[in-house]
């Protein structure tokens, strides 16, 4: 009797895939800080980091060494357990959310029938990390930043979910692979669900607290917001977690609206990973371009925009999609 039964081999392969994907995401999140600075320098007609190594390519290694050797200080007035737990929860929730994203037909961690719901569960868990960080720091600026962040995240997650309901109505499934395969046989959802895409993208920027929705970390108002008391690797986990969030939202946009691993018009299906990577990289660059080109609005304007613009748009999109699907459904199937 051998231990390496087909079931055991499948488990080992799944674990190896999970480790490879999660390590790749963490490394990519760290590298994005360098990529962002280089792109911002290019767009703003300056050099950016260009001193460490050829073309500044070793700058990220220098930053990581600096962060690693910094004092991992915990304020004496902080709740030490929750203060330490917050960055772990923040980064873990984002990494676990990657489990349901299919990168290629064969590469993915978990093929869940409730993939979309699982993503929203993990996204909601990240709110607790922000609240933990702000409250446990025992700092008024950190607390105000965490309250801003949690209110903003919860508000925009509502529209993020409603924006995807049009896709669920058309496909009839919460499974990510089903959504990708549906787009392979029909139009990519960027066309029939354009308004849902717009709302999801806006909500994605807001949920990741990226510019122009970075009010929870506004330096001029809150002195860096909910992670003001963090230093060393704890701060580094929040820092890298922000870039992992960008990768996550970009990968979701590709999966849900741009055909996932499929190329345009089914071109070169054997290059599945290339198409997924190329489309994800485009949206990552778009996130960075927003930081370089759009001013930061006031917090009340951000919240007003969410409830007065995003909510009606998502509801109209959902109602129109439901009506179109109902009209195209045979009467016998409806009964």
Swiss-Prot record:
Single GO biological process annotation from the record: aerobic respiration
GO (cellular component) term, any one: plasma membrane
Alphabetical keyword list: Cell inner membrane, Cell membrane, Membrane, NAD, Quinone, Translocase, Transmembrane, Transmembrane helix, Ubiquinone
The keyword Membrane is assigned to this record: yes
Membrane topology recorded in Swiss-Prot or TrEMBL: Multi-pass membrane protein
InterPro entries linked: NADH_UbQ_OxRdtase_su1/FPO, NADH_UbQ_OxRdtase_su1_CS
Location relative to the cell: Cell inner membrane
Group of enzyme by EC: translocase
GO molecular function terms listed in the Swiss-Prot or TrEMBL record: NADH dehydrogenase activity; oxidoreductase activity, acting on NAD(P)H, quinone or similar compound as acceptor; quinone binding
Stretches that traverse the bilayer: 11-31, 81-101, 114-134, 154-174, 187-207, 238-258, 270-290, 309-329
Pfam families hit by this protein: NADHdh
Known catalytic reactions: a quinone + NADH + 5 H(+)(in) = a quinol + NAD(+) + 4 H(+)(out)
EC id: 7.1.1.-
Keyword Acetylation in annotation: no
Quaternary context: NDH-1 is composed of 13 different subunits. Subunits NuoA, H, J, K, L, M, N constitute the membrane sector of the complex.
NCBIfam families, sorted: PRK06076.1-1, PRK06076.1-2
Entry's family note: Belongs to the complex I subunit 1 family.
Role this protein plays: NDH-1 shuttles electrons from NADH, via FMN and iron-sulfur (Fe-S) centers, to quinones in the respiratory chain. The immediate electron acceptor for the enzyme in this species is believed to be ubiquinone. Couples the redox reaction to proton translocation (for every two electrons transferred, four hydrogen ions are translocated across the cytoplasmic membrane), and thus conserves the redox energy in a proton gradient. This subunit may bind ubiquinone.
Protein name (database record): NADH-quinone oxidoreductase subunit H
Protein species of origin: Pseudomonas fluorescens (strain SBW25)
